[in-house]
Amino acid sequence: MSEPLPPAEWGLVDLSVAEPGEDLVAIGGGLVPGTLVSAYRQGLFPMNVAVTGHGGGRSEALGWWSPDPRGVLYPASLKVSRSLASSVRRMDTSVDQSFVDVVRSCADPHRPHGWITEEFVDAYAELH
């Protein structure tokens, strides 16, 4: 049995006071397992955001997002087209074979403002 996760290291945002239509609801905090799990349970996910400092310089900060409206997939209602079903039959599927490699493959280093950095890879690997 795994050890219980530590609590979030900072107070997460109360979404009931978030402005309607605002997707970015907080900036800051850290990517430790307790914070990640607490955030996901509250409908938040982390993704870096570009910020402009007082001198006009730009940098990245950890943003916490809760899209409004949020896209939700209901598996029981999912309609799979024939072309998708055909494509899926030609694929190999596995579970828990190479978690870190999969996360790294989701990162696109050539994409401007790509947010899956090594910090994210390490955080999700620790959580996994």
Indicate residue ranges for each PLM-predicted region.
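N-acyltransferase acceptor-side catalytic subdomain
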Residues: 1-128
